[in-house]
Swiss-Prot record:
Region: Flexible region, residue numbers: 85-174
Segments of skewed composition (Basic and acidic residues): 122-137
Phylogenetic lineage: Eukaryota, Fungi, Dikarya, Ascomycota, Pezizomycotina
Family according to the record: Belongs to the ATG3 family.
Active site residues per record: 245
Region named Handle region: 249-332
An MF annotation (GO) of this entry: Atg8-family ligase activity
Organism encoding this protein: Aspergillus oryzae (strain ATCC 42149 / RIB 40) (Yellow koji mold)
Region spans: Disordered: 108-160
Name of the molecule in the record: Autophagy-related protein 3
Alphabetical UniProt keywords: Autophagy, Cytoplasm, Protein transport, Transport, Ubl conjugation pathway
Biased composition (Acidic residues): 145-160
């Protein structure tokens, strides 16, 4: 059954009409040309990623150039397994993370993303999370949030925290380190990137496919993440894959939030011109920090502008007309994509792939 599903998925991607019209800002989808642009940026900025070709010309897709069929990074560490205490009670009713901007409710699956830790105790956990929400006052200042030891970090709350993706295992619970090769392909049917991953127990010992699910959050196993044949290789190479059916809606939500955060930051900067005490702090946490980091990157403009930095010395600051400035450009798409994919496999150190 799984073989049939993989085959149908591959042919659906290859036979679907190819879109050449950019709808990036409105839908979260990208065209093949935009995928190549975003891939070029990822490779340029983070050299651990590289372009790769299909194993033979017959495996190539026509809408991507030879030599740029997919992106790959190798040897990404994974230091621990995810158990039920981490993932919650898999197998109960699924819950969706709704777009917090629109406050969507019930009914429509396509506008959300499976929330980790579903199950009979989800109401209690949700109540605890509600207590943890930080407010923003009229001046754009974020309220204080109490830190809890057992809280699973969220990318929006811990963007600059080195432990945002993975925390060190507790003493006495050391587990063998696995490594993963990560592959980013383009789904022509869904018009979004798609992630595949292949695990290894050692450099010469592949991880059996079913054991890869030990590194996937429980509620995503066999739902959002399934075992699929990698279409660009001969020999039916089985990998774990994050299904792209909701990638566009999640990316659209992140784009909208980033634009809202950028607008808020502009307002705070304007206020700072008359009152310096209201100036945004350097390295501000949350999605505003993500906006500050990502909007400073460009593949086409390699010249540093002055000594002003944002989000790290390796990210150049660009000059934009204020009216035309956007929080996240299409060439930065894959950086944000990898940040939300990390929520599916938090044990895999995705930030390791972004070392320069």
């Amino acid at each position: 059954m799984n073989i049939l599903h993989s085959t149908l998925s591959t042919w659906r991607d290859r036979l679907a009409p190819v879109s050449r019209t950019s709808t990036f800002r409105n839908t979260g989808q990208i065209t093949p040309e935009e995928f190549v642009l975003a891939g070029d940026y990822l490779v340029y900025k983070f050299p651990s990623w590289s372009w790769a070709d299909a194993s033979n010309p017959a495996k190539r897709v026509s809408y991507l150039p030879p030599g740029k069929q997919f992106l790959v990074t190798r040897g990404v560490p994974c230091h621990r397994r995810l158990n039920d205490n981490f993932a919650g009670d898999a197998g109960h009713d699924d819950e969706l993370v709704r777009d917090m901007l629109s406050g969507g409710t019930g009914g429509v699956d396509d506008d959300g993303w499976l929330r980790t830790g579903g199950g009979q105790d989800s109401a209690d956990r949700q109540e605890n999370r509600i207590k943890d929400v930080r407010t923003v006052d009229e001046s754009g200042n974020m309220g204080e949030r109490e830190e809890e030891e057992d809280e699973i970090p969220d990318m929006e709350d811990e963007d600059d925290d080195e432990e945002a993706i993975i925390r060190d295992p507790a003493s006495g619970t050391t587990q063998p380190t696995r490594t993963y090769n990560l592959y980013i392909t383009y789904s022509n049917f869904y018009r979004t990137p798609r992630l595949y991953m292949s695990g290894y127990l050692s450099p010469s010992e592949p991880l059996p496919p079913h054991l890869m699910m030990e590194d996937v959050v429980g509620d995503y196993k066999d739902k959002t993440v399934t075992l699929e044949d990698f279409p660009w290789y001969d020999g039916n190479v089985k990998m774990a894959s994050v299904h792209p059916c909701r990638h566009a809606s999640v990316m659209k939500t992140l784009l909208d939030r980033a634009d809202a955060a950028l607008k808020l930051r502009r307002e705070k900067l304007k206020q700072a011109q008359s009152d310096p005490s209201k100036a945004p702090s350097v390295g501000e946490s949350g999605l505003e920090g993500l906006v500050d980091d990502i909007k400073a990157l460009s593949l086409s403009d390699q010249q540093q502008h002055g000594s002003d930095k944002s989000g790290g010395d390796e990210w150049e600051v660009l000059q934009h007309d204020e009216e035309e400035q956007v929080a996240i450009r299409v060439d930065q798409y894959l950086v944000v994509f990898l940040k939300f994919i990390a929520s599916v496999t938090p044990g895999i150190e995705h930030d390791f792939t972004m070392g320069v």
